Amino acid sequence: MDQGYYLSQSVEIPVGASLYIEPGVTVTCKSEVQVPVEIVVLGNLYCLGTAEKPVIFTSDTRKPADWGGIICGYNSEEVVLNHVDVAYAGATPTESSASFQNKLFKTTIDGGVPAFHFCNVNGKFVMANSFFHDNYNDQTYFTGGNGVIINNIFADSGNAADGGEAINVKAGCKLDVANNIIYNACTNAFKLSNAGNSEVIPLSEMTVYNNTIVNCGWRRSKNKKGGSVWVEKAAKPVFVNNLIYDSRFGLKQPKKDGADMEHSRLTPNYYFASTETGVAQMAKDAELGIWFDTDIKSSVAGQLNPLFKSFKQSEKMNINCEIDDVAGCSIGIRKELEFRLSGRQSCSLRRCNRFCPPLPTRSAILRHEAGEFPG
């Protein structure tokens, strides 16, 4: 019988200690508490789920911002999240919160925490085969670490007032991000930045490819600075062979302090829009947009539809809607929805596929699947 744990207060994993969570375990966080529940990882965390028996972090009322998140410390050496569901996180900490007491993520109380945060420049993490959904702020936020983010689903992140990215990256990271589905991120699927760079925090190196980005950006009602991918503060990612589908904007950067264009690789990618508004907002003359002739883009509404196997867009889709539960808003996602391609555009997508990076860090996933992790 699978085990379940009910948390009414935060759990703190000490420096040097490791917590292993076995397949099928469900951790339910109580929502009606004075100090939001958090999982603070000062040591190591290994969530070792399987496809049949994922590890689940949820809440008792199943509402966004019911609990904090998984917040890792500056000495956290290794974290593995394999076949893990993380939902309803993003609560605002208090001065009594474990993350705040350990000076992690928030040094002032001015908003919620992400569902998963990693910050050790020398640490390692793996996120694989996991499902992050209905989290009130960013799904993930990285200010350091060497990580692999592969084969995950990130759905329904953020809130209209404060935004919320699926994958938010600052300086200090070396990341390999591939084969993820990002659906309905409030602001961007990816926010890629070198904010925080210093003598001890190096510039980030990011390789982002073969990801599917669907319906992102439409809920952001304030500071509309993104809608699929935002690159700033001299970030220099490799961002290629990604599919961006019906998101509010295409690739963007600020007027000042934008991407390091000389050292980035930001094309080819595939952009589809089912509406004329979508076509206009990712066009060559779109404000703050980054344009490449080598990308594949819809030039009229509905052109180059990738034809997903079991996902069908709402006929009333309005990528500037900004409000949930009205005509034109994005439909909810089911974990079993297939975003694999079923139709004739697969050949066009393969035209983008000119990138096969080495992935030495993926060996960590293979070691875990073989029962050898950690080494």
Residue ranges and their predicted role:
Residues 1-22, 27-375:
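Extracellular beta-rich repeat passengers
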